[in-house]
Amino acid sequence: MAPAADREGYWGPTTSTLDWCEENYSVTWYIAEFWNTVSNLIMIIPPMFGAVQSVRDGLEKRYIASYLALTVVGMGSWCFHMTLKYEMQLLDELPMIYSCCIFVYCMFECFKIKNSVNYHLLFTLVLFSLIVTTVYLKVKEPIFHQVMYGMLVFTLVLRSIYIVTWVYPWLRGLGYTSLGIFLLGFLFWNIDNIFCESLRNFRKKVPPIIGITTQFHAWWHILTGLGSYLHILFSLYTRTLYLRYRPKVKFLFGIWPVILFEPLRKH
C-alpha cells in the first residue's frame, strides 16, 4: 500500500479504504492514480466488442453477461483509481464478486442443454453475492473482500483444471494461458503491495519512462483483465464445443484473440 504523504487533487481527500502504490496526482490534477486508471481500458473495450459479437452470433445470454460484467469491473476500477473515493471503491470491488459469480455459473453449466437454467446454482450464487455485499458494507475490511474473491477464483481454477484434464484436453493451451497470465498479474499485485516504498524510491532515481514500467498495480489490471477475457473465451469455447458450434480461436489483426464459428457442414 502507499505511504500516507500523497498530494490532493481535483477529487479532494482520499476516502477509500485502500490507496495503492502509484503516487497520487503525479501525472494530472484530474486523475488520482493515472496509470492505475488508464490500464483498465483492457477490461472495458475488448469485452464490449465480445458482448456485441456474442449478440450477433446468437449466443446464450450468460456469455453476453460475462463480457458486460468484465466491462463493468473495468469501469468501476477506472472510477475508483481516478477518484480514490469509497463509493467508487465499492463500484470496483463488488462487481468483481458479481462477475466471478457469473463466470462460475457459466463454467458449471457448460455441459447442459442449450438455454437451460440451473435455478439452484443461480440462487446459491445470488445469495452468496448478497451476503458478501451485506457483510462488506458493514465491516469495510478489504481483506474480507479479497478472501471472498479468491474463493471464487479458486473455484474457477479447479473447474477449469477438471475440464482440460478429463473433458477437453486439447483446450489446455487456452485454459492454462488464461490461468498463467492471471497468476502473473497476482504476483505483480503482491510486489506492488510489499515493496511499495522501495518502488517509489526507485522511481525517483530513474527516468519517468522507466518508472512507468514499475507501476505493478497497473500491470495487475492489464494481466488480470487479459486473463479474465481469455477465461471467458475458454468457457465459451467449452460451451459451444459441447453444443457442436465448431468454435475456433482467431486473432484479430493478428494480435487480439476472439472466438469465431465455422459454418456447420451440410451432409
Swiss-Prot record:
Q: Pfam families this protein is in?
A: Ceramidase
Domain of life according to the entry: Eukaryota
List residues binding Zn(2+): H81, H217, H221
* pH dependence text: Optimum pH is 9.5.
Q: Which residues bind Ca(2+)?
A: D19, W20, E22, N24, E33
Q: Where in the cell is it found?
A: Endoplasmic reticulum membrane; Golgi apparatus membrane
The protein in question is named: Alkaline ceramidase 3
Species of origin reads Homo sapiens (Human)
| Gene name in the database record | ACER3
